Amino acid sequence: IESAYFRNKFEPELGRFIGSYLGIGVISDMESQPITVTSHLGRFAVVTVGRIDNLEEISAQLLKEKIHFAEMSGSAINPTEVVSILINKGETFKEGIENVYRMVKGSCSFLILTDSCIYAARDKFGRTPIIIGKNEFGYVVASESSSFTNLGYNIVRDLGPHEAIRVSKDGITPIIAAGCRKQICSFLWVYYGYPSAYYLSLIHI
């Protein structure tokens, strides 16, 4: 979904979800998402939320390495494509996520969808939240909890800064432990957060 807060109908797309129990999405004001990649890691899709302060620096380095960008947003490089390239530089998804943490300055939380699971990674300072929910049918991860009640999910917990998990039909598997450094942006929560959302499992905006 691009430049829209809601879509009230998804009928044309519903047939594409038959037989699948996994999915990701994002509302983006700027770039088109998700980005789909086929590489040595297999076929995967990526969505991101946040701001990459050193996007130009990373992009310039990748161009020196003769890597091209195809998912342009107008004349600008798509930040989500940059994240997908950094992920793809790892030998595993864990290494790829760690590469994003190492290279990106700013705030970038993201989800990776594969054929069998979803990886959820919160930015290294915890500025953009990722919250886990659960019901009798499975799990959900989102940037805020406001939709959980209407969909029948209970809040499990927030991911910590620099934390990454793997979500599959078998449950949740830790991938990267949470870091100790947290620099939350309460203004972001107040400005963008829905009134019924909870943050850190206890702050009600």
State each model region's role:
Residues I1-P161, R166-L202:
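Conserved short alpha-helical segments that host acidic/polar catalytic motifs at enzyme active sites
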